């Protein structure tokens, strides 16, 4: 069980989505955007940092479960100035999460779309629709918030798949242990995989 915060960074609007994962089940907790209407970049970065800090602290305060964070990686924009601003916004988001001692995983837009839609070149509307289906939402979230939720879903799928893969390979894996060339799991190992 875990809470996952997904972030879609942007210099004018940063989307976030928060889900609860229990095994294969994903449940919506929260989503929204942090708007930075000011023209000055330092003020925008401050708002992103403070907004994500406030949202994350709320969930840290009211949850006993571990919190994971996932952030969309920067794509190469045609305009270098846009790419730089996006990178700065992403840095402010990551700094807010790391300042609260969260581990941050990063995913490309293609990885997120592939995980959520099954197609790495899906458009924003397709991502919104699939987020609604996966989380059983009655109301379609705003695009940036849906992208934040999609990032969280991607992390849930990735971490759950990795745990299953680890469990299967560990149970069936062959190693160089002295006991018939098979790995042996202790109760502690099994508990750590849950």
Curated annotation (Swiss-Prot):
CDD domains: RuvC. Its cofactor is Mg(2+). InterPro entries: RNaseH-like_sf, RNaseH_sf, X-over_junc_endoDNase_Mg_BS, X-over_junc_endoDNase_RuvC. It is found in: Cytoplasm. PROSITE patterns: RUVC. PANTHER family: CROSSOVER JUNCTION ENDODEOXYRIBONUCLEASE RUVC (PTHR30194:SF3). Homodimer which binds Holliday junction (HJ) DNA. The HJ becomes 2-fold symmetrical on binding to RuvC with unstacked arms; it has a different conformation from HJ DNA in complex with RuvA. In the full resolvosome a probable DNA-RuvA(4)-RuvB(12)-RuvC(2) complex forms which resolves the HJ. The RuvA-RuvB-RuvC complex processes Holliday junction (HJ) DNA during genetic recombination and DNA repair. Endonuclease that resolves HJ intermediates. Cleaves cruciform DNA by making single-stranded nicks across the HJ at symmetrical positions within the homologous arms, yielding a 5'-phosphate and a 3'-hydroxyl group; requires a central core of homology in the junction. The consensus cleavage sequence is 5'-(A/T)TT(C/G)-3'. Cleavage occurs on the 3'-side of the TT dinucleotide at the point of strand exchange. HAMAP family: RuvC (MF_00034). This is Crossover junction endodeoxyribonuclease RuvC. The lineage of its organism: Bacteria, Pseudomonadati, Pseudomonadota, Gammaproteobacteria, Moraxellales.
């Amino acid at each position: 069980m875990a809470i996952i915060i997904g972030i879609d960074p942007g210099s004018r609007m940063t989307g976030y989505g928060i889900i609860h994962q229990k095994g294969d089940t994903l449940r919506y907790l929260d989503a929204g955007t942090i708007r930075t209407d000011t023209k000055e970049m330092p003020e925008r970065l401050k708002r992103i940092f403070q907004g994500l800090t406030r949202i994350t602290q709320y969930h840290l305060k009211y949850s006993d479960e571990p919190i994971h964070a996932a952030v969309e990686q920067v794509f190469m924009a045609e305009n270098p100035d846009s790419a730089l601003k996006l990178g700065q916004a992403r840095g402010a988001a990551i700094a807010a999460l790391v300042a609260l001692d969260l581990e941050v995983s990063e995913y490309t837009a293609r990885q997120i779309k592939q995980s959520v839609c099954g197609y790495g070149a899906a458009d924003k509307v397709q991502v919104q629709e699939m987020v609604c289906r996966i989380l059983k939402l009655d109301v379609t979230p705003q695009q940036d918030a849906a992208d934040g939720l999609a990032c969280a879903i991607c992390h849930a799928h990735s971490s759950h798949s990795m745990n299953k893969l680890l469990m299967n390979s560990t149970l069936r894996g062959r190693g160089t242990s002295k006991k018939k060339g098979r790995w042996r799991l202790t109760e502690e190992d099994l508990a750590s995989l849950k």
